[in-house]
């Protein structure tokens, strides 16, 4: 059955194919909203032959039931599609304005040592589950995948999209090519994590002889965001009661590193810059988000850096945050 049905269907499909080839497509986030836009065009503009400013603006206009963030989520892929068309001179309409991201009061879960021990115990004990219930590739992938998030602070999508060629097992370096904002950066693995990655690679390559992704899914594809969410939830809920998400392992990595700064020799500027770069923040100010997660740290830093604190770490609008 044809997925897209409006007059824009050939262009939409070309856009989706391009995004997939560029490995910047997330079916969960973008697919449903693009289909809704296509159906809107089919129903409201049945005789249209070209995308107009009216069509784009009417769809992207913020609805009464939406806040800025929900509107952003709905229209982002459509604005990206229009940008794609403009670059190829297939339309001359302007890009609709995307509402500014609103601050959220969300506070990431603060993991306890016991919770993390429970979580990784559940991951490791997949090996004891019957093969009929847990495929072999899943039981060996899950413990390594989530330990990588925990030990390196990389984003979940960065781990999902890691190619075999992006992982230097000799030097212990990850080349993060596809990321939030598409900013390339490098991450140095802890020696213990490097050993785990080497063991995993030796085992998984026997099952996937010529895999593209370091953590392969069926059909030589990468794992979906839903795969991460589902498996984290299943492992977490086995022995823990508080709510947590896989992405919060990144928050934990940042705050644990920052907490150590008050106990070690300070070297504030160098440590801040290193943490910012290793976490893939394109601007230094984005790292400031994590200071609000470490009780009392902002005051400590201000005392140690004096008047330069606000110059080094100014207020940010949380556009990049995490």
Protein language model features and the residues they cover:
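Conserved catalytic core of the tyrosine transesterase superfamily
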Residues: 1-322
């Amino acid at each position: 059955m044809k997925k897209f049905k409006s007059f824009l269907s050939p262009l939409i499909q070309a856009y989706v194919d391009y995004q997939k080839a560029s490995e910047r497509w997330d079916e969960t986030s973008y697919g449903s909203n693009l289909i809704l836009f296509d159906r809107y065009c089919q129903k409201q503009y049945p005789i249209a032959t070209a995308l107009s400013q009216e069509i784009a603006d009417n769809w992207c206009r913020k609805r009464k039931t939406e806040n800025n963030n929900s509107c952003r989520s709905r229209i982002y892929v459509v604005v990206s599609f229009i940008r794609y068309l403009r670059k190829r001179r297939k339309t001359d309409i302007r890009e609709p304005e995307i509402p500014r991201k609103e601050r959220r009061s969300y506070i990431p879960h603060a993991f306890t040592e016991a919770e993390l021990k429970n979580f990784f115990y559940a991951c490791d004990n997949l090996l004891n589950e019957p093969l009929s219930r847990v495929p072999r590739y899943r039981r060996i992938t899950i413990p390594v995948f989530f330990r990588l998030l925990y030990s390196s602070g990389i984003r979940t999508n960065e781990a999902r999209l890691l190619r075999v060629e992006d992982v230097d097992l000799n030097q212990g370096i990850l080349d993060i090519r596809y990321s939030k904002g598409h900013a390339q950066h490098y991450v140095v693995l802890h020696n213990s994590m490097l050993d785990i990655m080497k063991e995993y690679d030796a085992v998984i390559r026997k099952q996937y002889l010529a895999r593209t992704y370091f953590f392969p899914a069926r059909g030589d594809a990468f794992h979906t965001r839903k795969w991460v969410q589902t498996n984290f939830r299943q492992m977490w809920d086995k022995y823990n009661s508080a709510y947590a998400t896989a992405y919060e392992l990144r928050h934990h990595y940042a705050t644990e590193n920052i907490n150590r700064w008050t106990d070690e020799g300070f070297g504030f500027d160098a440590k801040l810059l290193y943490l910012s770069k290793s976490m893939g923040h394109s601007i230094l100010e984005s790292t400031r988000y994590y200071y609000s997660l470490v009780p009392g740290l902002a005051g400590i830093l201000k005392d140690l850096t004096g008047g330069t604190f606000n110059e080094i770490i100014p207020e940010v609008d949380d556009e990049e945050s995490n």
